[in-house]
Amino acid sequence: MTLFLPISEGQCDCKAAEAPARSRASLSRVNTTASSAPSDAPLASTRIGEGSRRVAFLHGLMGRGRNFTGPAKELGDDFTVELIDLPDHGASPWTDRVDYREIADRVAAHLRAGLAADGPVHLLGHSMGGKVAMVLALRHPDLVDRLIVEDISPRVSPQATDEFVHLLGTMLRMDLDAYDSRAEADAAMAEHVHDVRVRGFLLQNLRRTGGHFAWQPNVAMLFEHLREIGSFPDPVVPEDPERVFDHPVLWLAGAESDYVQDEDVPRMKELFPRVVRVTVRDAGHWLHADQPEAFVSAVRTFLTAD
């Protein structure tokens, strides 16, 4: 049975998530394809719905906006949802580094020119996208009404670095020229990434270019900057280091994930004094995929509350 449970400050209904098993075998080659968009081109995004409540979704590392298509549709007719591809992901342009302040400012400019042109919007971010969302809310509070942070905290996240060293390393070493189909690529990846859902998540980024497979995200650059991806800027706003985001914040955590820990609570409450922390049972780091009904219910309830 799925339960959606608030947990009081100082408690944690979490246990360590089992990472995909690592293989001793090695792969061989790097195949990536640069985004066709200039590095300063607009971010790619998709809108779903035409409701009065506006919310933007930011995905995690190796994700893309369309990962949230299901939840966006389930929110209902009251919502307009924008699914944004972060830089170096999906159809958005590539860059040469990872800097959360720069990414947040770029997403803010995208929102200011579109979804948030007429006023603040709600913002939801998962994992890496959750860090971007927190930084954006602190740097551009005029753009954000309510904030939802999914299974990440405003601190260093060693879990992300450890897990994605293996996953991105596997992607980069695959000889994509050797595969004639996605099934063949999946079989090769299965020797190193045993979880079929994780493989599906990674292989969504495989594209045919000039008759050959290539990775659409900027995998090599992201791999080189995993330490920065796992970090969190401090201060977020150098010119105003004491700034907080004093709007309602929903902090979702998967009960079977270890990305949110008790020691993260003081910093989260310091930056976001109106935060409410909630855990979702039987859910890991990708809780929107593990428990979609509970996820959508939580998001809708939070965004429609008076």
Identify what each model region corresponds to.
Residues 42-53:
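Short beta-strand-to-loop junctions in surface cap/lid or active-site-entrance loops
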Residues 211-271, 276-279:
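Conserved serine/cysteine hydrolase catalytic core
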Residues 52, 60-63, 127:
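Active-site glycine-rich loops that stabilize anionic/oxyanionic intermediates
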